[in-house]
Amino acid sequence: MRVISWNVQGRMKALPEQLKALMQRQPDLVALQEVQGRTVAQWRAGLQQHGLAFSAESITCAQAHGRTYGLLIASRWPITQLPWMDVPYQERVLSVQVAAPRGSFELHNAHVPNSDKYGWIKVETFEGIYQQLACISAVPRILCGDFNSPHSERPDGSLVTLGQEVRADGRAVVWDTWADKAGRSDTGMRWDRAERSVLTGLAAYDLVDAYRACNGYAVQGCSWWWMGQGKTVGRRFDHIFAARALNVATCDYLPVFHANGLSDHAPIEACFEPAVEGRIGHCRCSGAGIRQ
């Protein structure tokens, strides 16, 4: 089972090439971020033509609140949309239950807002995701998307969050307080805790970092690049977290998508080999945004 998560940057002219590149990977499930209203129908139709006949979207929800971008999930197997999470912008997390041949599982597609524009809304989004998913689930789960975090990771496995600053001697310390553009102020401790709660804390609830499970910390993959002051700095902002029962076999980034100018993000791709067929579970569902 092949899952690809990708921030497509709301592109319109590049969409045919984005779709072509994605379909060459032959995914079973696709989770897209930054899909806009003018492209969602084209995305759904194109994915359906390649066998991903079941889809759900949050663009309609975004537009209802005067916002532009949302999420799209497309699947080879039937899906049922789950209730919205309690986050500041509901369209930023789209959740479905997938009726796959080897058993049902949940897929949660997230796009955590960046801090430059949205400030503490980013932290509240992390907190909302953790509150929803920090529980023992009756079915396996996958959480994927663009999290705009962390700042960096170190070879020893330690994480540097955006709630920390790196001193000249290399030490990462939590900063004191910060006010965003809206004038909202809070502590670095809260920020640091919120990022860690999802990026590492959900492993306690069977949502394990698939990339690190497959590659360890000797490999430093990147999915987004900052360029300025004569240098380029890569960040691993896009992630897939998954239940152990789904048995991740490989997980890698696809930097050629970025190199070819298709988006400012590289997709992350994971292949799973679930060993045992399971019973399709029961879930509460809203049915909104579902299409077959």
Regions found by a protein language model. Name each.
Residues 111, 119, 134, 140, ...:
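Extended recognition/assembly regions associated with phosphoester-bond processing machinery
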Residues 127-233, 237, 286-289:
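Metal-dependent phosphoesterases centered on the DNase I-like endonuclease/exonuclease/phosphatase
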Residues 111-124, 181-187:
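Surface-exposed cleft-lining segments at the edges of enzyme active sites
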Residues 66-81, 201-205, 228-248, 272-273:
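Conserved beta strand-loop-helix elements of the APE1-like EEP
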Residues 2-8, 18, 22-41, 96, ...:
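Active-site beta-strand/loop signature of hydrolases that rely on acidic residues for catalysis
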Residues 35-120:
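Structured beta-strand-rich core segments of catalytic domains in phosphoester-bond hydrolases
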Residues 9, 36, 78, 111-113, ...:
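Catalytic metal-binding/acid-base residues of hydrolase active sites
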Residues 1-50, 63-71, 276-292:
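N-terminal, active-site-proximal structural segment of metallo-dependent hydrolase catalytic domains
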